[in-house]
Amino acid sequence: MLRMLIAGVLVVFACVNSAEAAGDDKSARGIVERLQNGIFEVLKHAKELGVDGRYELILPVLERDAHIPLMTATVSGPYWREGSKTQKERAIKAFAEMHSALLAALFDSYNGETYKTVKVRETGGKIVLVDSNIIDSDGEPTLVTFATAKIKGRWWVIDVIIAGGISEVKVKRNEFNRLLEEGGLDNLSAALERKKDRLLFGEEKAVR
């Protein structure tokens, strides 16, 4: 039953992504809207899919639209340069899967939330910021700013800032520092893998 539902949602994805309004990777605004569109399509089917179904659909959306390798390298700091190719590949996979599990656990219901792109801001450098309001069912907006960059001919999301706070990448870098100090990339990857499993099994509550 779950496989059939996932297949059905994937059909919806295909229809949505064929529409011009769904966004694309040719602009900063386009990549942000494509990422949000993908997440919101999963959110609309949250209850029926369950956490495992949401995870299976969110993971490819993140891998498609967020530059996971760059984000993993950034949060790992100097330990990234010290890692082998195998260690880096494991860390990238663990980072993507843990964040997908976190979103799958967080987005467990849909109450009519919507999103709206508010502004696209140049920074004078390679990064372009895209401000978006996530609007709840009461009409209350929460500002989410996506940092984007053009890498190898296309746009990627490389960081997220919620309600004008600190960037998620900086938060994660501080959070992961102890793990990296104690055992480098292997220790970080193992911790992320355990966290993913706890989130999917309901042994750990997702925190925004």
Located regions from the model:
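Bacterial N-terminal signal peptides
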Residues: L5-C15
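Soluble periplasmic/extracytoplasmic beta-strand elements of cell-envelope proteins
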Residues: E33, F40, L129-N133, L143-A147, ...
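Early exported N-terminus immediately downstream of N-terminal targeting peptides
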Residues: D24-L103
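Short beta-strand edge/turn micro-motifs at domain boundaries
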Residues: L143-V171
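Surface-exposed, charged secondary-structure patches
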Residues: S100-T142, L192-R208
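Surface-exposed, polar/charged faces of alpha-helical domains
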Residues: G23-G30, E41, H45-D52, E82-T86, ...
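Low-complexity, intrinsically disordered terminal/linker segments enriched in charged
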Residues: I161-R208
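Sec/Tat signal peptide C-region and signal peptidase I cleavage site
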Residues: C15-G23
